[in-house]
Amino acid sequence: SINTPDGAIVYMGDYVIDSTMKGAYDMDLGKLAYIGKQGVLLLMQESVFSEKTGFTSPNHKLDKYFKNAVEKSEGRLIFSILPLHLLTIQNIFDAVKGTDRKVVVMGKYLQTIIEMAIREGYLDVPNGMIGDLKDLKEKNTVILVSNDREAPYYNLSRIVNGYDKYVSLEVNDSICFADPSYEAQELTSVKIKNEIAIHGINIFDVPKNKNVRLHASSQDLMLMVKIFNPKYYMPIKGEYRYQVANAKLASLVGIPNENIFLKENGDVVYIEDGTFVDKGEHIKVDDILIDGKSSSDVGELVLKDREMLGNNGLILISATVDKKTKQIINGPEVLSRGFIFAKDNLDVIEEIKKKSLEIIKNN
C-alpha cells in the first residue's frame, strides 16, 4: 500500500486467503485490518476469478498430488512447472522431503528464480536436496523443467522428442504436470501428452476440477473489501466481463456504485483532496513490439542483429520430415532475402539444397 494524506492506496496482487499457510506465505489479516482502520482511499483488486463462487482455498493445494507422484514413480520424476509459481515449487520440495531423491533444476532462468527465492526466504529447501547435472542419470532423481505460457511445454517437448542434450527419457521415467494448461494451451497440452504416451511414459496429472491458479475468488474479494473498507474501489486485471463481476461484488458489500471505477487501459484516474475528479483524460496506449521474451525497449544488441541482417541478408532452409519415419516428405526449400537473387543463382541454390539434404539425412 501507499500512504497519502487522504488515506492509503492499496494494490492487491494475485492472492488467495488461506489461514493454514505459514512462513513467507502467511497472510496477516490483522495487519491488513490495521491498514483498513487507518483509512483506505482506493482499493484495487484483480478480477480473474471474480465469477467463481466461494473461496479459492483449499482448491489451490497440490501437495497430496505431488506426494502421490513422488511415492508411486519407479524411476526419475519430471515436473513441468511455471517458474513464478513459487507455492507450487514449494509443494514439490515438500513432497520430496524425507526421501533420498535429489532435485535437479533445468535451465538458467528457473535456477536463478529458485536460488533467489531460497535466498529471500520464499522457498524452504533442505540443504543438499538440490543436485546438479551429474545426478540426472540417477534413477530416483526429481527434475524440474520450466513451462512458458508464451511457448507452452517447449522445454518438456525437447526432452520427450529427444532434442535435449542433458535429459533423455528412460523406460521407468514419469512426468507430472504441476500447473494447469490455460484455455489457449489445451491443444498443445493434448499433443505433448500424446507424445509422452507413445513413449510409454507414466503421466501424473492434477485433476481438471482442481482450481490451482492462485487468484482470488468471489468470497476472497468480498472479504478484502470488508477488511479494507475503502472509499473508492477499482477492479483490475482480467477480461472486462470479470472486472464487471468484480465491481458487482464490491457493490454487494457496501461500496456505492458511483465510487467504483471500471476503467480501460490508458484511462487516468484523478483523486484530488480525497475526492474523485473525472477529467476524462486518456493516455494513448499502443501495442508493444516484443522481441523474443523481452517486452522492454529493443536493445542495442537486437538493433545490431537487425543491422547485420540488413547488410548481409538471410537464407532460410525448410523441409517437411515425417516425425515417425524421419523420411523427407517435401523439400528442402531455400528462401533467400537480401542475399542473392534465386533466379540468377540457380546453381548456388541447388548446391545449398544438396548440402541441406545431406545434413537432414545424417541427423
Predicted feature descriptions by range:
Residues 106-179, 280-302:
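A contiguous, basic/glycine-rich beta-loop/short-helix subdomain that forms a polymer-engagement track
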Residues 198-216, 220:
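Generic long, charged, amphipathic alpha-helical segments
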Residues 40-41, 75, 221-238, 246:
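Proline-aspartate-enriched helix->loop->beta-strand connector
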